[in-house]
Amino acid sequence: MPYLHRSLRPQPQPVPGDARTIHSSGQSFEQLRQGCLQSGTLFEDADFPASNVSLFYSERPQVPFVWKRPGEIVEKPEFILGGATRTDICQGELGDCWLLAAIASLTLNQKALTRVVPQDQGFGSGYAGIFHFQFWQHSEWLDVVIDDRLPTFKDRLVFLHSADHNEFWSALLEKAYAKLNGSYEALKGGSAIEAMEDFTGGVAENFQIREAPEDFFEILEKALKRGSLLGCSIDTLNASESEARTSLGLIKGHAYTVTGLDQVNFHGQRIKLIRVRNPWGQVEWNGPWSDSSPEWRSVDLEEQKRLGHTALDDGEFWMAFKDFKIHFDKVEICNLTPDALEDSALHRWEVTIHQGSWVRGSTAGGCRNFLDTFWTNPQIKLSLTERDEGQEGCTFLAALMQKDRRRLKRFGANMLTIGYAIYQCPDKDGHLSRDFFRYHASLARSKTFINLREVSERFQLPPGDYILIPSTFEPHQEADFCLRIFSEKRAVTRDLDENIDIDLPELPKPTPQEEETEEEQQFRALFQRVAGEDMEVSAEELEYVLNAVLQKKTALKFKRLSLLSCRNIISLMDTSGNGKLEFEEFRVFWDKLKHWMDLFLQFDVDKSGTMSSYELRTALKAAGFQLGGHLLQLIVLRYADEDLQLDFDDYLNCLVRLENASRVFQSLSVKNKDFIHLNINEFISLTMNI
């Protein structure tokens, strides 16, 4: 696959209405639907076929599933029946309670729900077996188109379904989300906050309940009023505890939805209550304030009605907030915008987005524990210029998300352990070196490195310039990431890898023969013996000359220069264009080669005859090539071996091609030093010659 440059520059916050359709046909939902209506056919989605490939990638169904359209399951199917509510969500035979908890939370915010579940579809007029749903993914909204064939067994939906068997919006939403992530199996296991963010483009904040602030009830209450999506769960100590039921009816390792908070009068006291929903649609808390507990007998009937108290086993229940804090461990809040939950006033936050990659051998440096490679990670400069209203510092929230890991599960990819550190920026600009991190500690960091899709943290720092370094915990781990910076006042962010600066010295003029050094005279004799009277060598002859000379350099450990390197050298130095190298051209190159050899020996730290690819950035800069992260990634992919090492031949080949490309660009960019204009013939000619 050809390389496509992915910019790390800040991206604008996307407009939710501008969703991009990702169907392989290139057509929008409406175009596809109209095509089906005109042809009188029901839509069949070739991108997500009604077969096992869309169900599982590592197993097979234990019973034969039959894909059926809603009209083949019930007589009168409805898309949404009586409004989309949290009771429309009942878990099936798939371990995606985290997704169902997020959908239940989504139903509490009508505006967000309408965006994810467009209302321009149904089983009435205009029905063509096609539906669409919108999800946020890494800075943009995607419109996911599906057909309405659903997996069934004995005419019952196998996976997510509504309590009313005629209603299908929730089952179709689950299918669209499965398509987005590659299969239904990809939805097994997760955190509710992941789907909440995909439903809103919001930003997550996580609370360990035992460490929560004193006003935690008010924080949650305010979050619900602002339309935030809330989930909660109970931790497990080991895998055997997953979905184990406690004596009070709670399920460990299971995702619940927080659907309400309130207070009631009880024996002259105001009791704080929290309403929680189990996406199974059954199995509830059976302690104080549960559906049939005696506490409700002391509550006025009007008050019970206001709270929606029922004794149905529908998976939703009230419990005292003090009991909630004892029995639950974690609360996840997805803020539609990261409004400060501790303040009563709403704020409009500024948002910048950076897309980047950790690439093994060049930008996958790991955390600060790995000093030798940590500095090679992407570095984002953050300039905080304005203090918050009435505050001494500047508030911002940094959210680091690893991309597409769920979609890549079928290929063995798991969530990586990620986090970030923030440093005071020194006066000088440019990518910070290893020595900086050797002598400077971070000012702030994510609380922990953790294997979640996103790590987010709120900070308040004095005005100034800072460097934020996102990384995996271990080095050499590859992933794409999305970094979002939310700030109360305008903040300027810039990627430090973007600056490319190439400093090429002027080519020296030929030295008169009578002024040649003893070494040059020896070269002339060897050159003349190989080249003959015309004093020009071919690539094969140059290979012989250079290897004969370099084999005598005992400090330089390498097998031999390749013919490819010699061809590239001639391409760089051949001014006549005859494919051969004259002696004067060779002498100029020899001066370069001596300098490049000295650099190689300097960065061959263990004197093994190879250089670590992580040292390449510094070595190239010393040779006059300050390159951005994406170029370094390309170079490492091309020249480093599987152990992330470059031998001298690879190193030399890289430098020769870099200088050749740079000099060609300089010769063509006469009017504008940043751009050149080429037609297809010129472009291909150049690429074949570099």
UniProtKB/Swiss-Prot annotation:
<dbReference type="InterPro" id="IPR000169">
    <property type="entry name" value="Pept_cys_AS"/>
</dbReference>
<dbReference type="Pfam" id="PF01067">
    <property type="entry name" value="Calpain_III"/>
</dbReference>
<feature type="binding site">
    <location>
        <position position="606"/>
    </location>
    <ligand>
        <name>Ca(2+) 4</name>
    </ligand>
</feature>
<dbReference type="GO" id="GO:0004198">
    <property type="term" value="F:calcium-dependent cysteine-type endopeptidase activity"/>
</dbReference>
<keyword id="KW-0645">Protease</keyword>
<feature type="binding site">
    <location>
        <position position="615"/>
    </location>
    <ligand>
        <name>Ca(2+) 4</name>
    </ligand>
</feature>
<dbReference type="InterPro" id="IPR022684">
    <property type="entry name" value="Calpain_cysteine_protease"/>
</dbReference>
<dbReference type="InterPro" id="IPR022682">
    <property type="entry name" value="Calpain_domain_III"/>
</dbReference>
<comment type="similarity">
    <text>Belongs to the peptidase C2 family.</text>
</comment>
<dbReference type="Pfam" id="PF00648">
    <property type="entry name" value="Peptidase_C2"/>
</dbReference>
<feature type="binding site">
    <location>
        <position position="81"/>
    </location>
    <ligand>
        <name>Ca(2+) 1</name>
    </ligand>
</feature>
<feature type="binding site">
    <location>
        <position position="580"/>
    </location>
    <ligand>
        <name>Ca(2+) 3</name>
    </ligand>
</feature>
<protein>
    <recommendedName>
        <fullName>Calpain-9</fullName>
        <ecNumber>3.4.22.-</ecNumber>
    </recommendedName>
</protein>
<keyword id="KW-0378">Hydrolase</keyword>
<feature type="binding site">
    <location>
        <position position="88"/>
    </location>
    <ligand>
        <name>Ca(2+) 1</name>
    </ligand>
</feature>
<dbReference type="InterPro" id="IPR002048">
    <property type="entry name" value="EF_hand_dom"/>
</dbReference>
<feature type="active site">
    <location>
        <position position="278"/>
    </location>
</feature>
<dbReference type="InterPro" id="IPR018247">
    <property type="entry name" value="EF_Hand_1_Ca_BS"/>
</dbReference>
<keyword id="KW-0788">Thiol protease</keyword>
<feature type="binding site">
    <location>
        <position position="574"/>
    </location>
    <ligand>
        <name>Ca(2+) 3</name>
    </ligand>
</feature>
<feature type="binding site">
    <location>
        <position position="314"/>
    </location>
    <ligand>
        <name>Ca(2+) 2</name>
    </ligand>
</feature>
<feature type="binding site">
    <location>
        <position position="167"/>
    </location>
    <ligand>
        <name>Ca(2+) 1</name>
    </ligand>
</feature>
<feature type="active site">
    <location>
        <position position="254"/>
    </location>
</feature>
<feature type="binding site">
    <location>
        <position position="608"/>
    </location>
    <ligand>
        <name>Ca(2+) 4</name>
    </ligand>
</feature>
<dbReference type="GO" id="GO:0005737">
    <property type="term" value="C:cytoplasm"/>
</dbReference>
<feature type="region of interest" description="Domain III">
    <location>
        <begin position="338"/>
        <end position="521"/>
    </location>
</feature>
<feature type="binding site">
    <location>
        <position position="576"/>
    </location>
    <ligand>
        <name>Ca(2+) 3</name>
    </ligand>
</feature>
<feature type="binding site">
    <location>
        <position position="83"/>
    </location>
    <ligand>
        <name>Ca(2+) 1</name>
    </ligand>
</feature>
<feature type="binding site">
    <location>
        <position position="316"/>
    </location>
    <ligand>
        <name>Ca(2+) 2</name>
    </ligand>
</feature>
<keyword id="KW-0963">Cytoplasm</keyword>
<dbReference type="InterPro" id="IPR036213">
    <property type="entry name" value="Calpain_III_sf"/>
</dbReference>
<feature type="binding site">
    <location>
        <position position="604"/>
    </location>
    <ligand>
        <name>Ca(2+) 4</name>
    </ligand>
</feature>
<feature type="active site">
    <location>
        <position position="97"/>
    </location>
</feature>
<dbReference type="InterPro" id="IPR001300">
    <property type="entry name" value="Peptidase_C2_calpain_cat"/>
</dbReference>
<feature type="binding site">
    <location>
        <position position="610"/>
    </location>
    <ligand>
        <name>Ca(2+) 4</name>
    </ligand>
</feature>
<dbReference type="InterPro" id="IPR011992">
    <property type="entry name" value="EF-hand-dom_pair"/>
</dbReference>
<keyword id="KW-0677">Repeat</keyword>
<feature type="domain" description="EF-hand 3">
    <location>
        <begin position="591"/>
        <end position="626"/>
    </location>
</feature>
<dbReference type="GO" id="GO:0005509">
    <property type="term" value="F:calcium ion binding"/>
</dbReference>
<dbReference type="GO" id="GO:0006508">
    <property type="term" value="P:proteolysis"/>
</dbReference>
<feature type="binding site">
    <location>
        <position position="585"/>
    </location>
    <ligand>
        <name>Ca(2+) 3</name>
    </ligand>
</feature>
<feature type="binding site">
    <location>
        <position position="312"/>
    </location>
    <ligand>
        <name>Ca(2+) 2</name>
    </ligand>
</feature>
